[in-house]
Amino acid sequence: PCILAMGRENLPLAAKISVLNANYVKENLRDYYALPIEGICKHEFVFDGMRAEYGGSHSDASHITTLEVAKRLLDYGFHAPTIYFPLLFHESMMIEPTESESKETLDKFIDVLKKIALEARETPHLLRTAPQSTPVRRLDDVKAVKDARFTYTPEVN
């Protein structure tokens, strides 16, 4: 529906803006997050966790994980990006800003990810216990896998 609404004549412009947005975000965060692939990206790019100086050393068992970064983004009102995919890297975090995001929104996203990197270095417990501000906090992923329920059953009081 979105492509149809843009019309054939605007689709090439939307694609160019999407590529521009991805490269803008990538270049503004490269000093904070590990960038395993250099060069100009298309509409998306992948970080391999945080740079070591912000607590992202994969060889350290206490490193800040991509999951913790993604959970902390929720506290700032951003949807968590795709994480641990593609499987090419240990701490993959795929960033895919769309063509419809304003520069103001991109700048806010960049500022938040920079702030999260600084939090990881100075107050890592904020990331380890994130999200703090969502109605549901950390889910028990192991329990969810072992006790999978695929239908909703209302609780009876």
List each language-model region with its residue ranges.
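N-terminal cofactor/phosphate-binding cores enriched in small/glycine residues
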Residues: 2
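Non-catalytic terminal extensions of PLP-dependent enzymes
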Residues: 5-157
